[in-house]
């Protein structure tokens, strides 16, 4: 549904150039919720603004629903008629709600329909339906100043849906909201994704957003995508930075002759007593150094850091036992020396891409 190829954006800043995007290749499948995460300055907002050409890419292509938007951009600063028509299929929600304070909630949602030339009766009906969809039918005659932050963002979402888009872009839409309101907005985005078949591309710096709502995710750093894949693939990939951030676990070896292993549980394996089985089967004492578990996409997923007695060479069989139970097991690098070994799955998911940034 959304594909960027070799996307580059360079800004001119006085006497120097600033590269915000450096050859970004991104593919968002139809009907999925895709999260792009990274620290401030990573290039996330530049990326999402290039997707609908609010920012003109310096080079590369952007394709949405099979149409190359960069080919429609034209040469002037004003968007071509073809690009404006293509943009009606792309809705966008911003961090700051950008509502007109002098207009009612209903009038704010009607605004894009006015611009599209929809008749008064039809746009009022459409705006009312959208407010009902986002749970604000009773606020149609209210003004933005009378709404909470979460309600304002719901109005922004309703407005973004006015043109019946196929794609919804969300630029840090929950970063100014409290945790409870954030959860309600994320649930709304997921509901809209499922009810309307929307493809959602969201930008965030919060790992909880990815964990709560995303099917796939990408990590950006210095204008490049350094890791991407479905959330399930990322969690199943030893050494994944995103997996580590989604489910952080800590703890170091208590002595030199100890082996520390990160174990990832997914699905049925998350509810089985595998660690106690390991202890009984091999008659070894296992220390749990840290653990994190949550539900992602309706599946229970977790990571646990355990310590086994003895060096790695003495624990090859117990670690193999963990793999036989359908778990991912990775030996953690010794902080005092190079990593002894890493136990990896027999086959890395083909759809997962990972790039080392030099």
Curated annotation (Swiss-Prot):
Q: Which UniProt keywords apply?
A: Amino-acid transport, ATP-binding, Cell membrane, Membrane, Nucleotide-binding, Translocase, Transport
Chain residues that bind ATP: 38-45
Supply the InterPro entries for this chain.
Answer: AAA+_ATPase, ABC_transporter-like_ATP-bd, ABC_transporter-like_CS, ACT-like_dom_sf, MetN_ABC, MetN_ABC_transporter-like, NIL_domain, P-loop_NTPase
| Catalytic activity line of the entry | L-methionine(out) + ATP + H2O = L-methionine(in) + ADP + phosphate + H(+); D-methionine(out) + ATP + H2O = D-methionine(in) + ADP + phosphate + H(+)
GO terms for cellular component: plasma membrane
Top EC class, one word: translocase
Main location as per UniProt: membrane
Q: Which domain of life does the UniProt lineage start with?
A: Bacteria
User: What would you give as a GO molecular function for this chain, any one?
Assistant: ATP binding
Q: Any idea where the ABC transporter domain is?
A: 2-247
Pfam families associated with the record: ABC_tran, NIL
The chain's disulfide connectivity reads: none
Q: What is its EC number?
A: 7.4.2.11
Q: Where in the cell is it found?
A: Cell membrane
For the keyword Transport, the answer is yes
Membrane topology summary? Peripheral membrane protein
Protein family membership: Belongs to the ABC transporter superfamily. Methionine importer (TC 3.A.1.24) family.
Q: What does this protein do?
A: Part of the ABC transporter complex MetNIQ involved in methionine import. Responsible for energy coupling to the transport system.
How the protein assembles, per its UniProt entry? The complex is composed of two ATP-binding proteins (MetN), two transmembrane proteins (MetI) and a solute-binding protein (MetQ).
The protein's name is Methionine import ATP-binding protein MetN
């Amino acid at each position: 549904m959304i594909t960027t190829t070799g996307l580059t954006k360079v800004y001119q800043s006085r006497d120097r150039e600033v590269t915000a995007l450096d050859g970004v290749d991104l593919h968002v499948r139809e009907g999925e919720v895709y999260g792009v995460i990274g620290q401030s300055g990573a290039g996330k907002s530049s990326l999402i603004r290039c997707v609908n050409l609010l920012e003109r890419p310096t080079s590369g292509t952007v394709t949405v629903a099979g149409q190359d938007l960069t080919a429609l951009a034209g040469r002037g600063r004003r968007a071509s008629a073809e690009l404006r028509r293509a943009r009606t299929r792309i809705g966008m929600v911003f961090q700051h709600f950008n509502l007109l304070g002098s207009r009612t909630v209903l009038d704010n949602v009607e605004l894009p329909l006015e611009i599209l030339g929809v008749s008064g009766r039809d746009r009022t009906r459409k705006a009312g339906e959208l407010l009902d969809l986002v749970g604000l039918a009773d606020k149609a005659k209210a003004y933005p100043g009378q709404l909470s932050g979460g309600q304002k963002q719901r109005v922004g979402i309703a407005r973004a849906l006015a043109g019946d888009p196929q794609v919804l872009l969300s630029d840090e839409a929950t970063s100014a909201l409290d945790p409870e309101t954030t959860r309600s907005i994320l649930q709304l985005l997921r509901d809209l994704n499922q009810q309307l078949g929307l493809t959602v591309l969201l930008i965030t710096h919060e790992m909880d957003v990815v964990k709560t709502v995303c099917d796939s995710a990408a990590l950006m750093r210095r204008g490049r995508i350094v890791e991407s894949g479905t959330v399930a693939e990322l969690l199943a990939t030893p050494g994944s930075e995103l997996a580590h951030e989604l489910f952080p676990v800590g703890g170091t070896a208590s002595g030199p002759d100890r082996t520390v292993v990160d174990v990832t549980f997914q699905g049925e394996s998350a509810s089985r007593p595998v660690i106690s089985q390991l202890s009984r089967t091999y008659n070894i004492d296992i220390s749990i150094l840290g653990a994190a578990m949550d539900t992602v996409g309706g599946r229970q997923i977790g990571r646990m850091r355990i310590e086994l007695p003895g060096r790695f060479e003495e624990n090859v069989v117990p670690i193999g036992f963990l793999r036989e139970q359908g778990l991912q097991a990775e030996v953690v690098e010794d902080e005092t020396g190079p990593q002894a070994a890493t136990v990896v799955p027999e086959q890395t998911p083909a759809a997962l891409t990972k790039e080392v940034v030099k």
